[in-house]
Amino acid sequence: MSSKSQLTYGARASKHPNPLAKRLFEIAEAKKTNVTVSADVTTTRELLDLADRLGPYIAVIKTHIDILTDFSVDTINGLNVLAQKHNFLIFEDRKFIDIGNTVQKQYHGGALRISEWAHIINCSVLPGEGIVEALAQTASAQDFPYGPERGLLVLAEMTSKGSLATGEYTKASVDYARKYKNFVMGFVSTRALTEVQSDVSSASEDEDFVVFTTGVNLSSKGDKLGQQYQTPASAIGRGADFIIAGRGIYAAPDPVEAAQRYQKEGWEAYMARVCGKS
């Protein structure tokens, strides 16, 4: 599997075949940030406050919308307004994992109305190829109003201790991503997946999957529930294009200062990589 991680975000944006990935790289280049903040708060007020305060320093805000105790249309409207104001994308970390017919209804419709506001979603391929096919099918339907403004990340690896997302599971993640590359924009993984040998050999010259790495924290190596952290520099050095930081930012004494620090360290690591110094 090829990697274009040595290229700048601007260069990747100029040739990227996926419209949403292209937009994401353009945002990163314009704002000089590769930070995704995981805003794991439990009220709409907290979520929108964080989005507004941290918006200038991030490329993406990641939500777990089902942990909000007061989710409503005001949540959706507020997020959309702030995404436009600060030029960031919204990633709903739903981790879809069910049969195709069910995930189609969970994504486009249902109580959370995810397709209406989340630019990016993710899924596990544990149920098999059908889950990726179903989500891609929904996004490409003629009556789906959001089209190229939506994209999927395949959950290829996890940072939790003892994760079973390894080996054949990760290989299947790459296979399905290649097969449905019009909707799959990349992976959530702990590294670039260049060494994974895919059975789908139809990789085009413009193949350029985006890598998001979770579990980035400057002040901790892990938690009591098995989470294992790495630094922005180590994540970028292993092939991450975008780093995902949660408690290290939103639970800091000064979340804005923390976001700025992650932005600085993430950007410096990226510049070192594209300049051949990583």
Swiss-Prot record:
Substrate binds at residues 40, 62-64, 93-102, 229, 247. It is an enzyme of class 4 (lyase). This is Orotidine 5'-phosphate decarboxylase. Belongs to the OMP decarboxylase family. It comes from the Eukaryota. GO terms for molecular function: orotidine-5'-phosphate decarboxylase activity. Its EC number is 4.1.1.23. Keywords: Decarboxylase, Lyase, Pyrimidine biosynthesis. InterPro entries: Aldolase_TIM (IPR013785), OMPdecase (IPR014732), OMPdecase_AS (IPR018089), OMPdeCOase_dom (IPR001754), RibuloseP-bd_barrel (IPR011060). SMART domains: OMPdecase (SM00934). The active site is at 95 (proton donor). GO terms for cellular component: cytosol. It catalyses: orotidine 5'-phosphate + H(+) = UMP + CO2. Gene3D superfamilies: Aldolase class I. Pathway: Pyrimidine metabolism; UMP biosynthesis via de novo pathway; UMP from orotate: step 2/2. Pfam families: OMPdecase. GO terms for biological process: 'de novo' pyrimidine nucleobase biosynthetic process; 'de novo' UMP biosynthetic process.
